[in-house]
Amino acid sequence: MTIESRQKGVAKTARNPVKIAPQSTDQLLRKPSWIRVRSSNSQEFYEVKRILREQKLHTVCEEASCPNIGECFGKGTATFMILGDLCTRRCPFCDVAHGRPRPPDPEEPLHLAQSIAAMKLKYVVITSVDRDDLRDGGAQHFVDCIREVRAHSPQTKIEILVPDFRGRLDIALEKLFACPPDVMNHNLETVPRLYRQCRPGADYTHSLRLLKEFKARFPGIPTKSGLMLGLGETDEEILDVMRDLRKHDVEMLTIGQYLQPSIGHLPVMRYVTPGAFKEFERAAIEMGFSNAACGPMVRSSYHADQQAHEAGIIQR
């Protein structure tokens, strides 16, 4: 595979250990009435896109085909995706392209900081593709971005949504310790039984260790994780994962509905009702999470500023 070759859908997941059975459209579960996506046609939406293209930046909103892009861009917010738009993993739930990425762009931290300053954002989420090709998994680039954003917008709070730094955890954490964020987020995504199918190359206990070790070093910085429902898990398995997160000192939680980006991705096994999401939210608070956002359209960075406000991280 050459640098910049892009694989999506069936081509991306063809080498995964658990294959996705071909589906016709009549085999797909019908979306229920509570799954609604806002249209993308406001002036703010196009202004955000203009700034992103001028600064040659990527967002997970676009690359992962997030259903909330219309609402978030329409409000003038975005979740910035650094380190390129090609991921070294092949997760079959995700619409980000797989490929061999280019080296990190040394100008990206500055472009990111300038964009955030231009958008006058009080709260930003910075995420990345997986970069298994880099010795530190991209951790230094996260640090460079945090420093530039703080230099240009010292009042802006920064949440980072990091990959698992597989095989590079100690190096990555050492880098992050030099310039930590205001919120540390790493998604478990699903239950351990489904990791081989849903997160090939990832390890459940490794992800928990990442969250635990960061929290041990910075007890005053909130840690956060997210889960998707509809991949074949049971309610009790989700509750078990929530308990594991609390055992590893994670304080903030997001749970949302998995939506299949294309027929080349994992199918939706169930649509969870809004009432059931409310029950997970209630259970999360009872377990001791300081904040839990649970709902069909919730994503890890969706309304992250609101969640941070409710957790007392930012003031409005």
Swiss-Prot record:
SUPFAM superfamilies tied to this protein: Radical SAM enzymes
Question: Which keywords, in A-to-Z order, does the entry hold?
Answer: 4Fe-4S, Cytoplasm, Iron, Iron-sulfur, Metal-binding, S-adenosyl-L-methionine, Transferase
Pathway-wise, it operates in: Protein modification; protein lipoylation via endogenous pathway; protein N(6)-(lipoyl)lysine from octanoyl-[acyl-carrier-protein]: step 2/2
Occurrences of domain Radical SAM core (ranges): 73-290
State if GTP-binding is listed as a keyword.
Answer: no
Q: Which domain of life is it from?
A: Bacteria
Give the EC number(s) under which this enzyme is classified: 2.8.1.8
Which lineage is the organism of this entry classified under, starting from the top rank? Bacteria, Pseudomonadati, Pseudomonadota, Betaproteobacteria, Nitrosomonadales
A GO cellular component term found in this entry reads:
cytoplasm
Q: Which CDD domains match?
A: Radical_SAM
> What family does the Swiss-Prot or TrEMBL record give for this protein?
Belongs to the radical SAM superfamily. Lipoyl synthase family.
Catalytic activity, as annotated: [[Fe-S] cluster scaffold protein carrying a second [4Fe-4S](2+) cluster] + N(6)-octanoyl-L-lysyl-[protein] + 2 oxidized [2Fe-2S]-[ferredoxin] + 2 S-adenosyl-L-methionine + 4 H(+) = [[Fe-S] cluster scaffold protein] + N(6)-[(R)-dihydrolipoyl]-L-lysyl-[protein] + 4 Fe(3+) + 2 hydrogen sulfide + 2 5'-deoxyadenosine + 2 L-methionine + 2 reduced [2Fe-2S]-[ferredoxin]
Indicate what this protein is called per its UniProt record.
Lipoyl synthase
Which PROSITE patterns does this one have? RADICAL_SAM (PS51918)
Which residues hold [4Fe-4S] cluster 2? 87, 91, 94
Localization, UniProt: Cytoplasm
Residues annotated as binding [4Fe-4S] cluster 1 are 61, 66, 72, 301
Q: Name one GO molecular function term.
A: 4 iron, 4 sulfur cluster binding
Q: Per its Swiss-Prot or TrEMBL entry, what cofactor is needed? A: [4Fe-4S] cluster
